[in-house]
């Protein structure tokens, strides 16, 4: 008996079929070039509480780790499919908050032929020229595709479509699942149609568990791919055991495990038979090295070995 599709009960987002085609073409083109492709998921999902939603429960995530990791994967030669929360951190752009543009840029002359010329002091936007060049190179090469989600339902459907797009690449596909996905949701059939009124007194909500898509991803959607999940804890004493438990349950390849307070300076790369601590030194922090550079470098080496074992 065929297993039920775990995303079927969630409403399909507008444009999902079109995005599925775009992602499939992106993956097929890069696969034909012999290029590895990574899906980077980034940012948090939100869950509506009403059918015509006004109120939501939101899993907050800035998306910085996903955006910075996407940059590192592009620098390493991967094609990057970036599935991210709308208005969360975007590769390269996240380094330059909007408010800095207002003080850093100024018109350099009258607009000609509909073009506005701007200039900025180099020290007002440090690193901007390099970031712009890197982004434009990826865009010109067609190695970067960004796809937005907002709600949990958006994310689940687009993740499934992305997996189906990358599945034909076999072990050359990587999944880097850094998004902060909601654990609970209200089924559409149980949502009130209109805005929940505060005049009704204290609110009680019964929520269902979100299906763990790591299992169908590993078993059915992309069974030959190299798959990395993330585990964030606040207690250092349990983080490795929790990571190993996830590997045992889902049978994927790697868990990136980290502690809330130190997640930007060290992580553990955990596999079924090893654990590796990646740590930024004080000197590296002063030089602006980011932990995501070390994570991606480590995973790239593991991905190479993974591909070699299957060829």
Curated annotation (Swiss-Prot):
Entry EC number(s): 6.3.2.51
Recorded catalytic activity of this chain's protein: (R)-4'-phosphopantothenate + L-cysteine + ATP = N-[(R)-4-phosphopantothenoyl]-L-cysteine + AMP + diphosphate + H(+); (R)-4'-phosphopantothenate + L-cysteine + CTP = N-[(R)-4-phosphopantothenoyl]-L-cysteine + CMP + diphosphate + H(+)
UniProt record similarity statement: Belongs to the PPC synthetase family.
Organismal lineage: Eukaryota, Metazoa, Chordata, Craniata, Vertebrata
Role: Catalyzes the second step in the biosynthesis of coenzyme A from vitamin B5, where cysteine is conjugated to 4'-phosphopantothenate to form 4-phosphopantothenoylcysteine. Has a preference for ATP over CTP as a cosubstrate.
Any one GO molecular-function label of the UniProt entry: identical protein binding
Quaternary structure, from the entry: Homodimer.
Effect ascribed to mutating residue 233 to V: In CMD2C; decreased phosphopantothenate--cysteine ligase activity; decreased protein abundance in patient fibroblasts
Gene: PPCS
GO CC annotation: cytoplasm; cytosol; nucleus
Full protein name: Phosphopantothenate--cysteine ligase
Residues annotated with N-acetylalanine modification: 2
Pathway: Cofactor biosynthesis; coenzyme A biosynthesis; CoA from (R)-pantothenate: step 2/5
Illness the protein is tied to: Cardiomyopathy, dilated, 2C: A form of dilated cardiomyopathy, a disorder characterized by ventricular dilation and impaired systolic function, resulting in congestive heart failure and arrhythmia. Patients are at risk of premature death. CMD2C is an autosomal recessive form with variable severity and age of onset ranging from 2 to 20 years. Death in infancy or early childhood may occur in severely affected children.
Gene Ontology biological process terms in this record: acetyl-CoA biosynthetic process; coenzyme A biosynthetic process; heart process
Species of origin: Homo sapiens
UniProt keywords, alphabetically: Acetylation, ATP-binding, Cardiomyopathy, Disease variant, Ligase, Nucleotide-binding
């Amino acid at each position: 008996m065929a297993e039920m599709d775990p995303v079927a009960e969630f409403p399909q987002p507008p444009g999902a079929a079109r995005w599925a085609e775009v992602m499939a073409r992106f993956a097929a083109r890069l696969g034909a070039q012999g290029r590895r492709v990574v899906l980077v998921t980034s940012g948090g999902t939100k869950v509506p509480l009403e059918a015509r939603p006004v109120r939501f429960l939101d899993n907050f995530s800035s998306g910085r780790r996903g955006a910075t990791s996407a940059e590192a994967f592009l620098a390493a030669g991967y094609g990057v499919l970036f599935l991210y929360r709308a208005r969360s951190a975007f590769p390269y752009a996240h380094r330059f908050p909007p408010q800095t543009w207002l003080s850093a840029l100024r018109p350099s002359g009258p607009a000609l032929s509909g073009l506005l010329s701007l200039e900025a002091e180099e020290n007002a936007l440090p690193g901007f020229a390099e970031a712009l060049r890197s982004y434009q190179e990826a865009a010109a090469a067609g190695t970067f595709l960004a796809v937005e989600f907002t709600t949990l339902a958006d994310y689940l459907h687009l993740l499934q479509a992305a997996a189906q797009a990358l599945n034909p690449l076999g072990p050359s596909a990587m999944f880097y699942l850094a998004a902060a996905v909601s654990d609970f949701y209200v089924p559409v059939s149980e949502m009130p149609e209109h805005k929940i009124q505060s005049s009704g007194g204290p609110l009680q909500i019964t929520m269902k568990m979100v299906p763990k898509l790591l299992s169908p991803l590993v078993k059915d959607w992309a069974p030959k791919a190299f798959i990395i999940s993330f585990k964030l804890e606040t207690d250092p004493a349990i983080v490795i055991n929790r990571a190993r438990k996830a590997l045992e349950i889902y049978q994927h390849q790697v868990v990136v495990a980290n502690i809330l307070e130190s997640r930007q300076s060290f992580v553990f790369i955990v596999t079924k038979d090893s654990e590796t601590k990646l740590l930024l030194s004080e000197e590296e922090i002063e030089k602006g090295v980011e932990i995501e550079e070390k994570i991606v470098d480590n995973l790239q080496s593991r991905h190479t070995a993974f591909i070699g074992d299957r060829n």
